[in-house]
């Protein structure tokens, strides 16, 4: 098995409902270790840049508005098959389709306000982590 990194964003809806600790605890219980973390309020430019691949899609403006509506917690997580493991913990994008016990089933209210973001591939994770964290802000876990 490969040790990977993935990007996780706890979105404004979950932050606003005080689910940060519960969500991070689930990642850690699954063996995903935070190696970088920021609590921040995304600017419009940051949100537009991060979601640039969706710029031509109909939901882009609403997505940017939502992601800038309150603070988020951005983390780089490290662990065995981190991308897939993280996505399994999150559950389906649509919380109505998410398996019971997943983050989106437990904390999300809609496909638009779905509690968290997770990288969809190792390549995406590398790009997304670099978007938010400089190399000197990432600290591999040695203990």
From Swiss-Prot:
- Active-site residues, record numbering mapped to chain: 117
Q: Where does ATP bind?
A: 11, 59, 87, 93, 104, 114
Where is it chiefly localized? cytoplasm
GO biological process terms held by the UniProt record = CTP biosynthetic process; GTP biosynthetic process; UTP biosynthetic process
**Cofactors demanded by this protein:** Mg(2+)
Cite the Pfam families for this sequence. Answer: NDK
Q: Which UniProt keywords apply?
A: ATP-binding, Cytoplasm, Kinase, Magnesium, Metal-binding, Nucleotide metabolism, Nucleotide-binding, Phosphoprotein, Transferase
Which reaction is catalysed here?
a 2'-deoxyribonucleoside 5'-diphosphate + ATP = a 2'-deoxyribonucleoside 5'-triphosphate + ADP; a ribonucleoside 5'-diphosphate + ATP = a ribonucleoside 5'-triphosphate + ADP
From the Swiss-Prot or TrEMBL record, state where the protein is found. Cytoplasm
| GO cellular component, as recorded | cytoplasm
Give, as one word, the top-level EC class. transferase
The function of this protein is: Major role in the synthesis of nucleoside triphosphates other than ATP. The ATP gamma phosphate is transferred to the NDP beta phosphate via a ping-pong mechanism, using a phosphorylated active-site intermediate.
Quaternary data:
Homotetramer.
- Name the chain's protein: Nucleoside diphosphate kinase
Q: Which organism is it from?
A: Acinetobacter baylyi (strain ATCC 33305 / BD413 / ADP1)
């Amino acid at each position: 098995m490969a040790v990977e990194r993935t990007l996780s964003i706890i979105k404004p809806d979950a932050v606003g409902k005080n689910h940060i600790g519960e969500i991070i605890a689930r990642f850690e219980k699954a063996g995903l270790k935070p190696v970088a973390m920021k609590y921040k309020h995304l600017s419009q430019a940051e949100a537009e840049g991060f979601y640039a691949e969706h710029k031509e899609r109909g939901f882009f403006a609403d997505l940017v508005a939502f992601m800038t509506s309150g603070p988020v917690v951005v983390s780089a997580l490290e662990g065995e098959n981190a991308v897939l493991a993280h996505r399994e913990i999150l559950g389906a994008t649509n919380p109505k389709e998410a398996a019971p016990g997943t983050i989106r089933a437990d904390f999300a209210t809609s496909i638009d306000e779905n509690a968290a973001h997770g990288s969809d591939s190792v390549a995406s994770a590398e790009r997304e982590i670099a978007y938010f964290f400089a190399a000197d802000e990432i600290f591999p876990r040695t203990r």
